[in-house]
């Protein structure tokens, strides 16, 4: 079973986080998780330039450390960035102290007030501590572009089916999502415009 939209009960557990933005006009927020990755992030940046679209990249600190010039290029092209932990760790597997330490280590490189937990997983204590320093941005549409059980057309169909005004959509600029992303992202941008 795939869940492209977070269940209501989960959104109610973390009401202070941002799941979508209220919006009457046609405004959609594209976000990318897990980069920067040299094999895919430049392609994403070029595509966004081609369509004159800005996005927010939730970056993994260790990827930023390995690809500092690529991270700088994201910012140079006018996109926003957010923190996605240093090592893409799941909050539910770590103590509050260790999780916050990992997030803060990433922020030494990323320098952003935005945070998104990998897989959307965090504990109440972690969320409470994170809110002291960061704005927690979740999503209301996850494309599942990384899934081997979906093809690019199904990923695109997820975007069409679940997106509404104010939606925060998650794609992944990662190697495991590359094939589906290369198919679905251009079609999604065309459809969203």
Regions found by a protein language model. Give the residues of each.
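H/E-rich (His + Asp/Glu) clusters that bind or coordinate divalent metals
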Residues: 157, 184, 192
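Histidine/acidic-residue-rich catalytic or RNA/ligand-binding cores of hydrolases
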Residues: 150, 180-183
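N-terminal pre-catalytic segment of deacetylase/amide-hydrolase enzymes
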Residues: 1-31, 36-50, 66-69, 187-191
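Charged catalytic carboxylate motif
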Residues: 43, 102, 184
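Metal-dependent polysaccharide deacetylase catalytic core of the NodB/CE4 family, i.e.
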Residues: 27-28, 38, 49-176
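Short, intrinsically disordered, charge-balanced linker/junction segments flanking boundaries
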Residues: 105, 191-193
């Amino acid at each position: 079973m795939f869940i492209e939209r977070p269940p209501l009960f989960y959104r109610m557990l973390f009401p202070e986080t941002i799941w979508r933005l209220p919006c009457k006009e046609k405004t959609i927020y594209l976000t990318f998780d897990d980069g920067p990755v040299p094999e895919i992030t430049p392609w994403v940046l070029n595509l966004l330039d081609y369509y004159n679209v800005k996005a927010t990249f939730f970056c993994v600190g260790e990827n930023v450390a390995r690809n500092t010039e690529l991270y700088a290029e994201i910012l140079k092209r006018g996109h926003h960035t957010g923190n996605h932990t240093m090592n893409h760790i799941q909050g539910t597997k770590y103590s509050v102290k260790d999780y916050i330490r990992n997030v803060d280590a990433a922020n030494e490189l990323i320098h952003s007030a935005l945070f998104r937990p990998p897989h959307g997983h965090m504990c109440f204590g972690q969320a409470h501590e994170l809110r002291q320093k960061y704005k927690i941005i979740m999503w209301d549409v996850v494309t599942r572009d990384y899934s081997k059980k979906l093809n690019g057309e199904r990923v695109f169909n997820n975007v069409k089916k679940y997106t509404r005004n104010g939606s925060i959509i998650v794609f992944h600029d990662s190697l495991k999502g590359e094939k589906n992303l290369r198919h679905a992202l251009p079609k999604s941008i065309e459809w969203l415009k």
